[in-house]
A protein has these predicted regions:
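Conserved S-adenosyl-L-methionine
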Residues: 31-34, 116-120
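Short hydrophobic/aromatic-rich motifs at helix boundaries and adjacent loops
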Residues: 26-28, 75-78
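Histidine- and/or cysteine-centered catalytic micro-motif in compact active-site loops
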Residues: 35-36, 71-73
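Basic/polar N-terminal segments that are highly enriched at the extreme N-terminus
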Residues: 1-2
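Vicinal oxygen chelate
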Residues: 5-14, 53-72, 79-108
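A cross-kingdom feature marking solvent-exposed beta-strand/loop segments within repeated
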Residues: 38-42, 76-81, 118-120
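Core segments of cupin and vicinal oxygen chelate
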Residues: 12-63, 103, 110
Length: 120
């Protein structure tokens, strides 16, 4: 058995519309959205009474997908520390190739993003 492809990465967000706007600004395209709940969702999340809204986005080349998830029940919990260091266990980063770094940064700043350091 071998992996055929990576299907998607899932990110839990507090403000679904703001997250969608951020990634659409990067050039991702909406693929679909749904509210999901039921026993199978409880089972895969290890929680009871799960009700979430999800939006699936895809990269312009169609090879990468990102699932943005907003928990309505139970409410999402914050990971600590909020500004974790680079060596903290867990998801570290998602990286994208862009045509124009300066234009991309300017567009993302309109959505509240800021640089954490110089662009190399």
């Amino acid at each position: 058995m071998t992996i055929q492809r990576m299907d998607h990465v899932s990110v839990v967000v507090d403000d679904l519309e703001a997250a969608i706007a951020f990634f659409v600004e990067l050039g991702m395209e909406r693929e679909g959205a749904a509210q999901i709940e039921g026993p199978w969702v409880d089972r895969i999340n290890g929680l009871d009474g799960v009700r979430v809204d999800i939006t699936m986005l895809r990269t312009p080349d169609g090879h990468g997908r990102l699932e943005l998830t907003k928990f309505h029940h139970p409410t999402a919990v914050s990971a600590e520390p909020k500004n974790a260091l680079g060596n903290t266990l867990g998801l570290r980063s998602i990286m994208f190739a862009v045509d124009d770094v300066d234009a991309t940064i300017a567009g993302l700043r309109a959505h509240g993003a800021d640089l954490v350091g110089e662009v190399a």
